[in-house]
Amino acid sequence: MGVFNYEIETTSVIPAARLFKAFILDGDNLVPKVAPQAISSVENIEGNGGPGTIKKINFPEGFPFKYVKDRVDEVDHTNFKYNYSVIEGGPVGDTLEKISNEIKIVATPDGGCVLKISNKYHTKGNHEVKAEQVKASKEMGETLLRAVESYLLAHSDAYN
């Protein structure tokens, strides 16, 4: 098994605490509403949202995958940190064992925040991660973030 890691940082004008509430803590409800072209629904399979929770994320018709299952590994409300692993569906299968993801939202002096995202692809055997997989993952994350950000800018009373 090999591990391929990539890290990205992206900024938002939304304060860290507000973005964490909307994007992370209530993302299962909010994201399908604001980005139905990317995620059609999220089902809680087991757990209460904390570590060990299993979620099924369903994608709309025409998407390359029908679903993925995520396992929540850590939710740190104080440091705005969220770790989860993609354990089934999507790209996980013959060549990938899982994808571990860490999101940390850090406040910036201007009142916005920086999202620091680390993704670790755990491959099976000698398989390598394709550049297209990484690109698609980055684009999906950016799409979801910008949809949530737009919603929060349009609804200043939400998630305060």
Swiss-Prot record:
SUPFAM superfamilies: Bet v1-like
Matches recorded under PROSITE patterns: PATHOGENESIS_BETVI (PS00451)
One Pfam entry name: Bet_v_1
InterPro entries referenced in this protein's UniProt entry, alphabetically: Bet_v_I/MLP, Bet_v_I_allergen, Plant_def-hormone_signal, START-like_dom_sf
Family: Belongs to the BetVI family.
Name of this chain's protein: Major pollen allergen Bet v 1-D/H
Primary location recorded for the protein, binned into one broad class: cytoplasm
Cellular component annotations (GO), alphabetically ordered: cytoplasm; nucleus
Biological source species: Betula pendula
